[in-house]
Amino acid sequence: MQFGLDFNLVEELVAGVDEVGRGPLCGPVVTAAVILDPARPIEGLNDSKKLTEARREALFDEIREKAVAWCIARAEVEEIDQLNILHATMLAMQRAVEGLSVTPRLALIDGNRCPQLAVPSAPVIQGDAQVPAIAAASILAKVSRDREMQALDLCYPGYGLAGHKGYPTPSHLEALRRLGPTPIHRRSFAPVRAMLEQVSIEVEVPASVLLV
């Protein structure tokens, strides 16, 4: 049985904010902000990583139905490569909070730092396992990103994106070596950058030989 967090901890107009996808080698980083309704309990809220896929899917719909407000946002691969993953994540969190249809009086951010927001905010380390609103945000972000990676698996077959969701598993690294990076791979991440540099060297060597 998967026990959820105590819904009595929910406070009015407090947004929970979380992200999914900082570690993968490809795809966007996805964030969500959720303001829960203390009068509409949701059973079983917990850190998305502690829930089964089926339970996350069910909660995804229930959260969107019962929340006072919610927003799913993102930072694209190009933004990650340009800004770095930390700043891109902060940008995506800003977008999630700014996209809420109701302005929160406080935003609780999973982790140890907060993005610049127009509302008061506070970081909560391991917040997705403590704060129901952050847990709800983690579920929205994870389900949304997982669905996208499953769709991208059809666009870029052979990489196993539907399974590992872009994380640097042995099978993903092997596919990267065999097939090379796709347009959705993060060029600023070391394994992808190393592969691009290797390809560049392999292309340049014959040219230098011809010039001798």
UniProtKB/Swiss-Prot annotation:
One of its GO terms (cellular component) is ribonuclease H2 complex. It is found in: Cytoplasm. InterPro entries: RNase_HII, RNase_HII/HIII, RNase_HII/HIII_dom, RNaseH-like_sf, RNaseH_sf. Its cofactor is Mn(2+); Mg(2+). Keywords: Cytoplasm, Endonuclease, Hydrolase, Manganese, Metal-binding, Nuclease. Its EC number is 3.1.26.4. The keyword Phosphoprotein does not apply. Manganese or magnesium. Binds 1 divalent metal ion per monomer in the absence of substrate. May bind a second metal ion after substrate binding. It is an enzyme of class 3 (hydrolase). A divalent metal cation binds at residues 18-19, 110. GO terms for molecular function: manganese ion binding; RNA binding; RNA-DNA hybrid ribonuclease activity. It catalyses: Endonucleolytic cleavage to 5'-phosphomonoester. The keyword Transcription regulation does not apply. It holds the Pfam family RNase_HII. Residues 12-201 form the RNase H type-2 domain. GO terms for biological process: DNA replication, removal of RNA primer; mismatch repair. Endonuclease that specifically degrades the RNA of RNA-DNA hybrids. Belongs to the RNase HII family. This is Ribonuclease HII.
